[in-house]
Amino acid sequence: MSRPPPTGKMPGAPEAVSGDGAGASRQRKLEALIRDPRSPINVESLLDGLNPLVLDLDFPALRKNKNIDNFLNRYEKIVKKIRGLQMKAEDYDVVKVIGRGAFGEVQLVRHKASQKVYAMKLLSKFEMIKRSDSAFFWEERDIMAFANSPWVVQLFCAFQDDKYLYMVMEYMPGGDLVNLMSNYDVPEKWAKFYTAEVVLALDAIHSMGLIHRDVKPDNMLLDKHGHLKLADFGTCMKMDETGMVHCDTAVGTPDYISPEVLKSQGGDGYYGRECDWWSVGVFLFEMLVGDTPFYADSLVGTYSKIMDHKNSLCFPEDAEISKHAKNLICAFLTDREVRLGRNGVEEIKQHPFFKNDQWNWDNIRETAAPVVPELSSDIDSSNFDDIEDDKGDVETFPIPKAFVGNQLPFIGFTYYRENLLLSDSPSCKENDSIQSRKNEESQEIQKKLYTLEEHLSTEIQAKEELEQKCKSVNTRLEKVAKELEEEITLRKNVESTLRQLEREKALLQHKNAEYQRKADHEADKKRNLENDVNSLKDQLEDLKKRNQNSQISTEKVNQLQRQLDETNALLRTESDTAARLRKTQAESSKQIQQLESNNRDLQDKNCLLETAKLKLEKEFINLQSVLESERRDRTHGSEIINDLQGRISGLEEDVKNGKILLAKVELEKRQLQERFTDLEKEKNNMEIDMTYQLKVIQQSLEQEETEHKATKARLADKNKIYESIEEAKSEAMKEMEKKLSEERTLKQKVENLLLEAEKRCSILDCDLKQSQQKINELLKQKDVLNEDVRNLTLKIEQETQKRCLTQNDLKMQTQQVNTLKMSEKQLKQENNHLLEMKMSLEKQNAELRKERQDADGQMKELQDQLEAEQYFSTLYKTQVRELKEECEEKTKLCKELQQKKQELQDERDSLAAQLEITLTKADSEQLARSIAEEQYSDLEKEKIMKELEIKEMMARHKQELTEKDATIASLEETNRTLTSDVANLANEKEELNNKLKEAQEQLSRLKDEEISAAAIKAQFEKQLLTERTLKTQAVNKLAEIMNRKEPVKRGNDTDVRRKEKENRKLHMELKSEREKLTQQMIKYQKELNEMQAQIAEESQIRIELQMTLDSKDSDIEQLRSQLQALHIGLDSSSIGSGPGDTEADDGFPESRLEGWLSLPVRNNTKKFGWVKKYVIVSSKKILFYDSEQDKEQSNPYMVLDIDKLFHVRPVTQTDVYRADAKEIPRIFQILYANEGESKKEQEFPVEPVGEKSNYICHKGHEFIPTLYHFPTNCEACMKPLWHMFKPPPALECRRCHIKCHKDHMDKKEEIIAPCKVYYDISSAKNLLLLANSTEEQQKWVSRLVKKIPKKPPAPDPFARSSPRTSMKIQQNQSIRRPSRQLAPNKPS
């Protein structure tokens, strides 16, 4: 890159160099190269060159090189500054992600500064380098940047950082045509419009010397007006001089790819722009039919159909397509040598399909589009699919150890449509004037937009009101729901409280019972004791009788003993009471002492507080006096402040007035300047206009003069010849003179205008001078006012300083006052607290005094009692002495009595021993009884608790039982209904069998009749043949007779006449026979047609009856299993299945499997659609139902024989490349015999089977050559079988779908296993099914594999195919495989 020479003179250089014209021109050329946005060395490219170099070199391993380190030290900082100044992703707010592809994503963004909405495409540099495809984005950038066509999405700017490339493009809110086709049934009128726009858009691309190569509805976007624009130019390729392209890889989307592009993957890649017209034909077919013309489930099928397009292209009978449309599609979908558009776009435009009254090829973009998108705002993205957030980690370049140059391929990518760098050229000024006009136009448009936005806001308000109403209704509903829930919770709480109360009641009852038991026990004890007492009394009476003599003495002794015991007891109680009183006296004295000490302490504290209070009161008085003085000072200060504020406000008003005057002066100055500039502009414009008009007039005069001279010359030459035209010439001359006079008057007027303009200019000059003088005077006044303002500001500052000082003093004083007030409050609080303490202590003291007085009174009473007790005790002692003396006298008597007593005692001891034995027995029994009773009580308690629990359980069980009873009742009812249904079904089956038999009999009759009719037909045909032969013979005979030469004899005339008569008779007979035969033929043909129609109807009825029979059989099978389960359940008193049920691992019975599966549906969308069907697998059949109602009504949608199953397997991505990647683990495939299928009527035609010559047969396989552009492995050698851009040649079996390298076949390797599928492809069908989960898919596959017969089913040679040979919904659903690149504004 050569640097431009510096502007200054080089030292030592000759002067001639600086003024060299050649050097200046070279500099201008260099400048032009730098300014040119298409130049590889423009300003942005140069800046891009520095930035990636720094990014690629700024690594520790590379910095070890001294040269690199010096370079980085020199340019690192400036490059960072450049990055900060250039546009970056942070300049935009991301609204939503509207598309995601292999290399990045498309975001809907709003520019922060201008608030404009754009679509921003992000391309990962790492992904592009990793996939070695870092060149496709250049075509896309260049086309969008430099196309300048209304048919191409515009690029506003492109920039980059170290991770991504960014392309800020025009946002297309209408979405793509895939979205339009999925939302609308496209009529031919619309298809005509969109095809025309696509043709014009492709013509624009072709005129740029490029071929698109990936034309499809995904890359056709609609703007806000509904008009079409092309996008995704990553596959574009530059044409050579001959308008052709050389390429060895097949590029594009499989459904839209042309045969010549497909052939290019074999190395014959040489084709032209006609490949794009093929794609237009596919697109038109898809719009009119709803699907692509060469659709197949597999990639191989699609490619084979495209290559065999002559045979595989067919139009469905039910599609309403005009002849012109069919003709255009066929003209596009043909060989490239004869394809429409090969000789230019004009032959397409002239096709009769495009003829209409509404638009033509020139004004199509100005006409209203068929569908104008309804947008709620400028960021409305309702026409784009919602894209899930990408939670994956962003991959970046690893840190290199040597120079790699990862950023170098992206140098020069940066582009700005409105480039402001180096924009001081005259062309830029012209651009500015154009821009100003554009701005004015945009302002007008904005006004219209504002009106529309106001209308929109009113609509939105109405919508919000409706939403508020909805919300209010919803809130009411929620309130009602909440109230319901609260009532339910209340009910539950009440029920729980009831249970608790029942528990408590039961416990209380238990306690009551226990107490009753104990009372009973005590009563029993009492009775026992009473009985013992009675027995003892009896014994005592016996003893009394025996010991009458000793009774008196013992009684006396007992009395004395009792008296002694009583006195001793009294003494003990008195001593105890005395001790207690002493203790209480001691404790009360201690308490009194403590209270007295507390009282003293409180009195001391009170004295101290009173002294402190006096001090505080004094301080408070002093502070109040200080406060009053401060207040006086403050009022004085506030008066001073008010005065100062008044002065300041006056000064401020003066300043404001001065500013207003200044502003007025400046305004006048600006107005005058503007007026001056306007006048200058007017003057210049007038001068330019005048000069221009003068030049124009002069030119016209010169022309008129030359013409006049020429006419004169011509007139002079041709006067003799054209004498009659002299008058006309003179009139013309007069007109010319008039024109000249008019031109002269115009010239005079212009001169007058010029003079007036000059006068005005002179007046304006005078005005300008005056205004300048005024401005100078005003400036002087402004300076004076500025000085006054400065003085005033100084004064204001001084006053403000003083004010601040006074305010600070005031603040200090107020703070001191506040602190004093706070301390006063605290002291008051403390004083109040102490007073409260004192009051409480005084109350305690008074209470203690009362207690002490009470205690003293009690002490006196107790002392009196003591004295009385002591006196009594002395009396008792004397009595005891006397009694002792009496006792001593009586001891003698007692001794004698004791001897007797001893004898009695012995007897008594023996009786006591016996009594003790009985008592111990009674005690042990009593203990055992009590223990037993305690255990019983515990058990009873447990029993009550258990009973409660049982009650609760019973309540629950009652509910459960009621529910179970209900279920049992319902089951019984169902059982009854089932039994009745079984009976009915059996009857129905019998009836159906009878009907079947009758139908079969009728069929046999019809067949017999058909056979007889055929025999009759054969007879008639034979008769016809005989008649024809007779006729030919007769004709030949006649020809012979006619060709014979007539003999001369007269006698033969009679023979001739006779033969003529015979001939006429024969002709007559022939005619009559012909008429008879034709009548008979018509009659028998009618009968044949009627019989065939009857047979078709009967066969349809038979199929329907057979399907209903199959469904009934499966229902009977299910009912039988349910009956068995019910019987087992009733026997074992459980509802669950018994041990006898043989169930599979998945919970279903071994013989039966049922659930929801989805079949592929074909409509006009680009995504794989599925329709749910309820599938039942019985022991013999697989039944498909549209819904559970159809199942109940025994109306199956399709029935398959299990005996006719060939193969069941899970699919791979290559088998269903159109399906979503998430759905593939849930899809499986069933292969079955054609005759084992019963279905409802066909809506779509059966796809034609390809020719067998295209298949390579090997080991039972039927291989189809193909290529894989997405991850696939060879099933023979397990090596990769794919590549993104140059995949190896591959083979795929159309029977078992095994995939392998083509080299294995070419080298005749024995790696390839033989084909596992043994069936005739012409008599077999495949069916794709989608399960709800991968587990369900595995379950279905495993269970169906078990049901496949070991021997493959032999095809029935006599089986007739049903007239209803397909389902309502076709199996082969159109799934669009995404293109290689990411399209703008939409998911790719």
UniProtKB/Swiss-Prot annotation:
The modification Phosphotyrosine is found at Y722. Activated by RHOA binding. ATP binds at I98, G99, R100, G101, A102, F103, G104, E105, V106, K121. Residues 373-420 are annotated as: Interaction with NPM1. Residues 92-354 form the Protein kinase domain. Autophosphorylated. Phosphorylation at Tyr-722 reduces its binding to RHOA and is crucial for focal adhesion dynamics. Dephosphorylation by PTPN11 stimulates its RHOA binding activity. Residues 1-24, 512-532, 1345-1388 are annotated as: Disordered. Transmembrane segments: none annotated. Highly expressed in whole brain and in cerebellum, and at lower levels in heart and lung. Detected at low levels in skeletal muscle, spleen, liver, kidney and pancreas. Residues 439-1025, 1053-1131 form a coiled coil. Keywords: ATP-binding, Biological rhythms, Cell membrane, Coiled coil, Cytoplasm, Cytoskeleton, Kinase, Magnesium, Membrane, Metal-binding, Nucleotide-binding, Nucleus, Phosphoprotein, Serine/threonine-protein kinase, Transferase, Zinc, Zinc-finger. Residues 1362-1376 have a biased composition (Polar residues). Residues 979-1047 form the RhoBD domain. The keyword Repeat does not apply. GO terms for biological process: actin cytoskeleton organization; actomyosin structure organization; cortical actin cytoskeleton organization; embryonic morphogenesis; mitotic cytokinesis; positive regulation of centrosome duplication; regulation of actin cytoskeleton organization; regulation of cell junction assembly. The keyword Amino-acid biosynthesis does not apply. The active site is at D214 (proton acceptor). Residues 497-573 form the REM-1 domain. Its cofactor is Mg(2+). Pfam families: PH_MRCK (PF25346), Pkinase (PF00069), Rho_Binding (PF08912). A zinc finger (Phorbol-ester/DAG-type) spans 1260-1315. It is a peripheral membrane protein. Belongs to the protein kinase superfamily. AGC Ser/Thr protein kinase family. This is Rho-associated protein kinase 2. It comes from Bos taurus (Bovine).
